[in-house]
Amino acid sequence: MKHSSLIPVERIEKAIYLIRGEKVMLDRDLAALYEVETRVLNQAVGRNRERFPPDFMFELTREEITGISQTVTSSNLKFSKRVSVFTEQGVAMLSSVLRSKRAISVNIEVMRI
């Protein structure tokens, strides 16, 4: 069965990184997909911290940020103080804390990849 795509598959695939042996997505990339500011996404996570154990979400080290910023085009990532990444389970949990139809739709598409 073919699904209509809200977001091009290539856009999602380009936003997936392998860090610490886990496939993860950056907070800023997810915020862009959900059409919210990164700050808003991180505030929602902060209010629901118990839903995001370390195997769902973790902060990158300075070295990890430097490594990723070399592959991200036109990135100001290396100037960010904190960068959070989300595993597949963390991405699934985000729709429950963002509580929007867009978040649910985006998560379904991310899970299908």
Where are these regions (language model features)?
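Basic, low-complexity intrinsically disordered segments
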Residues: 1-113
